[in-house]
Amino acid sequence: MESPMHLPEVIAVQQESQQMGLSVTAPELHGSLSGLLAGGGGNGPDWLAMILADAEVAAPPKGSVLERLYQATASQLEDPDFAFQLLLADDGATLAARADALFEWCRAFLGGFGLAAHSRSVLSAEGDEILRDLAKLAQASVDDFDMNEEEEDGSLEEIEEFVRVAVLLLHGDCLIGPCAPQPLN
């Protein structure tokens, strides 16, 4: 049995998405889901309809790859050992494909985060800076980089780690900071 915190494989997420008739890539789906959860939203069965902005999309069936993706992502974000991981491209993908997947993931994350946090108070100064940095990555493309495999591979891994930690910081900001839900008085 897979660990509840283990993300499904990219290809499995892609295949199930296609079988459901969804025109979304695995990195885009995971980025949107991660943004929604990091911003404090998506705690119900309608998370998929929310991130796809389509009320007609059914919730993933119990035990499905997409339901496991949701459960693993939510568990990773809450893990005290900071286990959160990005679902990007397959291990054998080219550097350009990995970079494209990361930039696509960032664009989707911002959309999901906006869905969750749109009506909440402002983030901390650090949270605002992180969002600006993620927005810059979301606007990037592989054409912006000299794709020297050895040098750029290390740089891409550093950027992936930055994004991973940025998501955890934004999630923490929304849990304990100004965008956390406030009690009504």
Swiss-Prot record:
A Pfam family recorded for this sequence: UPF0149
Coiled-coil region list: none
Domain of life from the UniProt record: Bacteria
Any one cellular-component term (Gene Ontology): cytosol
HAMAP family xref list: UPF0149
Family: Belongs to the UPF0149 family.
Name of this protein: UPF0149 protein XF_2010
